[in-house]
């Protein structure tokens, strides 16, 4: 039995994403260090970093999801709107709506701009689609 690729979505056009160089390096390091424990989401995060347009760390990225951003997004399947803060794993706390970048939702949101949507597959092989409604950095 072959394993389905976590980020397998050949028919879907992925939106362009923008990430600061220093964050991309830290996120690549995180994906590498977590590859054994969380192989699917680590691979997804690494793929997102590979395709990201990198900008200088002092760039003005208003409206772009980055680490520490407060994000309002809509689950396109359910219509549910959520407000979260995107954080590193050690800062995650779902009761405070602090979502780790090392979750499928967190990895999907990083680098997106307001109005962009992304489709991805969860570890349970469910397809999800999220649209970013607002970002404050």
Could you describe each region identified by the protein language model?
Residues 3-11, 90-94, 133-137:
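Contiguous hydrophobic segments
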Residues 2, 8, 32-33, 53, ...:
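Generic serine detector
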Residues 1-64:
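N-terminal intrinsically disordered, low-complexity, charge/repeat-rich segments that act as generic
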Residues 47, 51-69, 74-78, 82-91, ...:
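Extended, charge-rich alpha-helical interface modules
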Residues 68-70, 77-130:
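Non-DNA-binding regulatory cores of transcription-related proteins
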């Amino acid at each position: 039995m072959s394993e389905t690729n976590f980020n397998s979505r050949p028919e879907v056009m992925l939106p362009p994403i923008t990430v600061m160089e220093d964050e991309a390096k830290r996120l690549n390091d995180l994906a590498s260090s977590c590859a054994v424990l969380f192989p699917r989401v680590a691979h997804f995060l690494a793929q997102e970093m590979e395709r990201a347009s990198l900008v200088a760390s002092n760039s003005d990225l208003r409206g772009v999801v980055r680490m520490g951003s407060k994000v309002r997004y809509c689950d396109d399947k359910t219509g549910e709107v959520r407000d979260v803060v995107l954080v590193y794993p050690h800062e995650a706390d779902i009761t405070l709506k602090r979502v780790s970048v090392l979750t499928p939702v967190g990895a999907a949101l990083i680098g997106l701009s307001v109005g962009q949507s992304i489709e991805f597959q969860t570890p349970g092989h469910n397809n999800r689609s999220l649209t970013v409604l607002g970002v404050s950095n």
